[in-house]
């Protein structure tokens, strides 16, 4: 299962650019995400049936309070089946943007047959 597509589709209602790893545009608001960890779960006959993917979701916003969009992102990810916890909100003085971090995780089917 491609977790990247799950994240992008889940966050589509935000109407913001969503990109894995980095964003190379010039929008004042955008979302990036990266894999923090991935490990096998639910073993049967010594073979994992699932992978648990842990991701960091980064929401960047310039010139506005990030709280409401941060809550929206959390709701959308949760609705899509992710476990979600809220991380810190930092202000980056060099870019003049708020940087919000959310931690998300999801179980997906391991397809070792492919």
Segment roles from a protein language model:
Residues 1-54, 60-114:
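Long, contiguous binding/interaction regions
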């Amino acid at each position: 299962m491609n977790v990247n597509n799950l994240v992008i589709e889940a966050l589509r209602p935000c109407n913001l650019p969503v990109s894995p790893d980095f964003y190379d545009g010039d929008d004042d608001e955008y979302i990036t995400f990266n894999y923090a960890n991935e490990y096998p779960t639910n073993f049967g006959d010594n073979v994992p049936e699932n992978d648990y993917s842990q991701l960091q979701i980064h929401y960047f916003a310039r010139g506005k309070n990030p709280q409401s969009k941060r809550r929206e992102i959390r709701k959308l990810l949760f609705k899509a089946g992710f476990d979600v916890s809220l991380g810190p909100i930092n202000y980056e003085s060099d870019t003049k943007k708020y940087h919000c971090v959310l931690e998300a995780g999801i179980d997906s089917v391991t397809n070792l047959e492919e």
